[in-house]
C-alpha cells in the first residue's frame, strides 16, 4: 500500500505540490501565449524585395513588395519569393514559440508540444 501523500508503489511525492506546479506551468504557458500573439515576425526574400510579416497567431499581417520585383513576364518568381518569405517568417514564429515553451518546461522534452 502506498504511503499517504505518495504514489502507488511507494514512490515518494506530494500530489498537492505537483498540482500547484502544473497550475503554475499552465498559467505561465497562457501568459507566454498571450505575449507571443502580440509579437510580429518578419522575413525577406530575393535580397529584400519581398518582406512578409506574421503575427504570433501565425497570421500574415503585412506583405511588402518592391516594385522592381514585379515582372509581368515572370509572375511565378514573385509568387515563389512571397512563399519563401512567408515560410521563413512562420519558422521564426515557431522557433520563438518553442524557445518560450522550453523556458517554462525546463526542457522536459515535448511536454505540451504544439500548444503554441
From Swiss-Prot:
Residue intervals passing through the bilayer: none
One MF term in the entry's GO annotations: DNA binding
Superkingdom of origin organism: Bacteria
Keywords recorded for this protein, A-Z: Cytoplasm, DNA-binding
Keyword Cytoplasm carried by entry: yes
GO CC, alphabetical: bacterial nucleoid; cytosol
Compositionally biased tracts (Low complexity): 13-26
Location(s) in or outside the cell: Cytoplasm, Nucleoid
Biased composition (Gly residues): 1-12
Pfam families: YbaB_DNA_bd (PF02575)
Region (Disordered): 1-42
Family classification: Belongs to the YbaB/EbfC family.
Its job: Binds to DNA and alters its conformation. May be involved in regulation of gene expression, nucleoid organization and DNA protection.
Subunit annotation: Homodimer.
UniProt-recorded name of the protein: Nucleoid-associated protein EUBELI_02017
Amino acid at each position: 500500500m502506498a504511503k499517504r501523500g505518495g504514489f502507488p508503489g511507494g514512490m515518494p511525492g506530494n500530489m498537492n505540490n505537483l498540482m500547484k506546479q502544473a497550475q503554475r506551468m499552465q498559467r505561465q504557458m497562457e501568459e507566454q501565449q498571450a505575449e507571443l500573439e502580440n509579437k510580429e515576425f518578419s522575413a525577406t526574400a530575393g535580397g529584400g524585395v519581398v518582406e512578409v510579416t506574421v503575427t504570433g497567431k501565425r497570421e500574415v499581417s503585412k506583405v511588402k513588395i518592391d516594385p522592381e520585383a514585379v515582372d509581368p513576364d515572370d509572375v511565378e518568381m514573385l509568387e515563389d519569393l512571397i512563399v519563401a518569405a512567408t515560410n521563413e517568417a512562420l519558422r521564426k514564429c515557431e522557433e520563438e514559440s518553442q524557445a518560450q515553451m522550453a523556458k517554462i518546461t525546463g526542457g522536459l522534452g515535448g511536454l505540451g508540444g504544439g500548444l503554441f
